[in-house]
């Protein structure tokens, strides 16, 4: 999945390697969508789910968490439950790692190192569901 630069805080395109499990869930979700363009549609048919919708759903469910907190949970899981490379886990979150000089030389997207992380994360999430 490609997140366009204009949607990213860093204004740089971010490629997210989706696991087979996530791709299957997205394919399954299509049947509930009212749009060919969006998998998750909002209240207005054919329009995407709004930016604040997930937060509103969590609030409705009386959950004491935020969408951004999911990122923290992922990072903590990577650090405490896996032995994945620090740089690769940071790249999963689209974090800039190292000094400006190091960043100038690290130009790859690390997709081959990030894919197994996302596969294992999907399995972990599914095991808790």
Regions found by a protein language model. Name each.
Residues 7, 12, 17-65, 73-74, ...:
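Active-site/catalytic core of tyrosine-dependent DNA strand-transfer enzymes
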């Amino acid at each position: 999945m490609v997140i366009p630069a204009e949607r990213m805080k860093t204004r740089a395109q971010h490629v997210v390697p989706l696991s087979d499990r996530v791709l299957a869930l997205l394919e399954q979700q299509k049947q509930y969508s009212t749009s060919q363009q969006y998998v998750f549609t909002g209240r207005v048919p054919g329009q995407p789910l709004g930016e604040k919708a997930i937060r509103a759903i969590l609030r409705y469910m009386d959950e004491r968490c935020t969408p951004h907190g999911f990122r923290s949970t992922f990072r903590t899981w990577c650090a405490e439950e896996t032995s994945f490379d620090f740089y690769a886990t940071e790249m999963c979150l689209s974090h800039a790692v190292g000094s400006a000089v190091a960043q100038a030389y690290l130009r790859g997207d690390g997709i081959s190192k990030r894919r197994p992380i996302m596969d294992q994360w999907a399995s972990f999430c599914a095991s808790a569901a």
